[in-house]
């Protein structure tokens, strides 16, 4: 299964959170399960993603929510309209 973000065209692939062309980004990847109509993203914060010891920086959480929800919406819309994720947007 290929991550939804990997279907994004190059001009959309620079996002700090999920852009595969952003060398310094987080490279968040979301996976769609068409049978369940659900998506999943897994991400393990690194020690340098902390706000204070033991707590993840809020900006990282916002990036996770943003990138995961955008990819999920794209996959859900594609499925609802019977489109392939591989089709050009």
Segments predicted by a language model, with ranges:
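Terminal targeting signals and extreme-terminal segments of soluble enzymes
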Residues: 1-89
